[in-house]
Regions:
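Aromatic, loop-rich ligand-recognition surfaces of beta-strand-rich domains
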Residues: 135
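A charged N-terminal "starter" segment
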Residues: 1-111, 116-132
Length: 135
């Protein structure tokens, strides 16, 4: 792996013929700090924006410990690379199996719902849990 100080350095030294992924941990840190200082609410990172493990791991190190997750694989990713972080299962449609895995296996307590049917599924999958945060 090569290290470049700026993306422009990469292009100048090694013009890419195919797409190139660039990891910029400093940019993640800068953005995390900016949002915490300038946003008055709780900062949640939407895993779907960039599910790279290095991003998920860098966020708690920079103060962001809440994640918007939309699937069990995203939940598992956060559990692995940002253990102890708060997760909100925000996908509008989720199976009872996914809800149960989120709740029982990974401690997710916040679930988004948009219909009565989704509420019924959340309650059924969690055994009518009393510690839910439903939004």
């Amino acid at each position: 792996m090569h290290t470049y100080h700026k993306p422009l350095d990469l292009v100048r030294q090694r013009p890419p013929e195919r797409p190139v992924a660039i990891a910029r941990p400093d940019a993640v840190a800068t953005a995390a700090h900016w949002f915490q200082e300038n946003f008055k609410g709780d900062v949640f990172y939407a895993v779907k924006a960039n599910p790279s493990p290095w991003v998920i791991e860098a966020l708690p190190a920079n103060g962001v410990t809440s994640f918007d997750v939309a699937s069990v694989p995203e939940i598992e990713l956060v559990a692995q690379f940002a253990p102890g972080s708060r997760m909100a299962f925000m996908h509008p449609v989720k199976s009872r199996a996914a809800i149960a895995a989120a709740y029982f296996d990974h401690g997710v307590r916040t679930f988004a719902l948009v219909t009565h049917e989704v509420l019924v599924n959340i309650l059924a999958a969690t055994g009518d849990a009393k510690d839910l945060n439903l939004i």
